[in-house]
Amino acid sequence: MKKEKAVVVFSGGQDSTTCLFWAIEQFAEVEAVTFNYNQRHKLEIDCAAEIAKELGIKHTVLDMSLLNQLAPNALTRTDMEITHEEGELPSTFVDGRNLLFLSFAAVLAKQVGARHIVTGVCETDFSGYPDCRDVFVKSLNVTLNLSMDYPFVIHTPLMWIDKAETWKLSDELGAFEFVREKTLTCYNGIIGDGCGECPACQLRKAGLDTYLQEREGANN
């Protein structure tokens, strides 16, 4: 894959930034694509742009604001509380988001001569999101190949690892401090370690604490 080109679906968060570093190591050329779907914090787009600029990665932002018209949710509406009731989808779930993001990433990839698409979806910590499942990604991969008659390969480096292992991967890629300090995972728009209270921050911190304990134990 070292001679090929990839497009990374990129939000500027921990997972997609780790995937960006992974792609840089795996492919000869990498581009990043970020989607503006009127998310609560436009800082997410700015953060993604800054990271791409710092890493020297060509960065495209696509307007997907129609998602907010079709599927109101807590990631785009400040008047909706971030909740996750047992047996129900989280209020942060956006119907069709990964379906559309990966589809548009594929269109872009074909236009720029890339057949590899990288996304940070993860089934281990999928938080009740059906479009983060491996079966969905594999199904969409086949559909995209058929729809555009093009040999896309969707890569999911984080699919079967948890947050602690994601931190480990970033460390192995030499990007641990970069990911910790410069990414935006927090639903409240705080870069780095975040607010520590929202579900995204709690998941990130739990993984970080576990990995740091494991790393310390391995070094002793």
Swiss-Prot record:
Question: Which gene codes for it?
Answer: queC
Quaternary structure annotation from Swiss-Prot or TrEMBL: Homodimer.
Keywords from UniProt, A to Z, are:
ATP-binding, Ligase, Metal-binding, Nucleotide-binding, Queuosine biosynthesis, Zinc
Q: Which Pfam families match?
A: QueC
For this chain's record, the cofactor binding note is: Binds 1 zinc ion per subunit.
What this chain does, per the entry, is described as: Catalyzes the ATP-dependent conversion of 7-carboxy-7-deazaguanine (CDG) to 7-cyano-7-deazaguanine (preQ(0)).
Q: List the disulfide bonds.
A: none
Query: Where do the annotations place Zn(2+) binding?
Result: C186, C195, C198, C201
Pathway(s) served: Purine metabolism; 7-cyano-7-deazaguanine biosynthesis
Which GO terms fall under molecular function for this chain's record? ATP binding; ligase activity, forming carbon-nitrogen bonds; zinc ion binding
- Output the superkingdom of the source species: Bacteria
Q: What is the name of this protein?
A: 7-cyano-7-deazaguanine synthase
Which PANTHER family does the UniProt entry name for this protein? 7-CYANO-7-DEAZAGUANINE SYNTHASE
Q: Where does ATP bind?
A: F10, S11, G12, G13, Q14, D15, S16, T17, T18, C19, L20
Q: Which family does it belong to?
A: Belongs to the QueC family.
Q: Which CDD domains match?
A: QueC-like (cd01995)
Q: Which HAMAP family match?
A: QueC (MF_01633)
Q: Which species is this record about?
A: Bacillus cereus (strain ATCC 14579 / DSM 31 / CCUG 7414 / JCM 2152 / NBRC 15305 / NCIMB 9373 / NCTC 2599 / NRRL B-3711)
What EC designation does it have? 6.3.4.20
Q: Which InterPro entries match?
A: QueC (IPR018317), Rossmann-like_a/b/a_fold (IPR014729)
